[in-house]
Amino acid sequence: MSFKDRLFICSQYLLPHHLLSRLIGFAADCRATWFKDRLIAWFARRYQVDMREAQVEDLQAYEHFNAFFTRALKDGARPLAQEPGAVLCPADGAISQLGPIEHGRIFQAKGHSYSLAELLGGDAELAAPFMGGDFATVYLSPRDYHRVHMPLAGTLREMVYVPGRLFSVNQTTAENVPELFARNERVVCLFDTERGPMAVVLVGAMIVASIETVWAGLVTPPKRELKTFRYDEAARAPIRLEKGAELGRFKLGSTAIVLFGPQQVAFNDGLGAASPVRMGECLALPKQS
């Protein structure tokens, strides 16, 4: 590891993650024209954001930076894979890792893995259906579309807010911060689907000011304590989302992790670590029994 990388990793442990993220979140919601127009223009230029696919192409039309960052796309900008039974990629970005969940652990990077149960908030019962299953981790870069969509149609069963740190998420931290995704703040969404249980985990990172879902709105930051929301109780109307429907969004970005049970899906042979992906592309197909 280079000296520069060592310095970066050391800074990750010393910086006040949540304070920085809250301050940046405040700036991202600022509506002052002189400020938000300059910030949006700089960001779009710095990260070469393609506005031609956005519903609103005019950078100055966004009321604040977060509205720009979570911008909607034009109809048809992300066609859904048409293969029978296709499991869709949930977000734009790049595959960080994908593969089997082995011995209750998920591969993070060379020399590092993390606990499935810890990812889901330390609940062994929640983790049980995914033991021996499969996972895919999608990293959303700053230039990407930052809404997360359903890989399969599903009925929401449970949502868990898991407090944690806000380490930056990139290749350097993945290779050098142990249990990165099981340490960062995250929102776990559990669904019942035609392929059995499915989890979509929205993982925060440094400067991720908040995570939203379409059914609950703003999920973070509440009080920093684990909180479970159940949606399969008789008193609640079922929440069902169709394949490709929006699930949630990052106000400033990070990572989406999708989990499936054993013998349910076979990942697209063309995908591997660092493969670029777009929401709606075929991530996997049903595994033949």
From Swiss-Prot:
Q: How does it sit in the membrane?
A: Peripheral membrane protein
One GO cellular component from the entry?
Answer: plasma membrane
Residue numbers marked as site, Cleavage (non-hydrolytic): 253-254
Active site (record annotation): 92, 149, 254
Pathway entry? Phospholipid metabolism; phosphatidylethanolamine biosynthesis; phosphatidylethanolamine from CDP-diacylglycerol: step 2/2
User: According to its UniProt record, where is this protein located?
Assistant: Cell membrane
Lyase in keyword set:
yes
Listed GO molecular functions? phosphatidylserine decarboxylase activity
**E.C. code:** 4.1.1.65
Q: Which GO terms describe its biological process?
A: phosphatidylethanolamine biosynthetic process
- The UniProt entry's coiled-coil ranges are none
Q: Which InterPro entries match?
A: PS_Dcarbxylase (IPR003817), PSD-B (IPR033177), PSD_type1_pro (IPR033178)
Q: What does this protein do?
A: Catalyzes the formation of phosphatidylethanolamine (PtdEtn) from phosphatidylserine (PtdSer).
Task: Give the protein family.
Answer: Belongs to the phosphatidylserine decarboxylase family. PSD-B subfamily. Prokaryotic type I sub-subfamily.
Quaternary assembly: Heterodimer of a large membrane-associated beta subunit and a small pyruvoyl-containing alpha subunit.
Q: What is this protein called?
A: Phosphatidylserine decarboxylase proenzyme
Q: Which species expresses this protein natively?
A: Pseudomonas aeruginosa (strain LESB58)
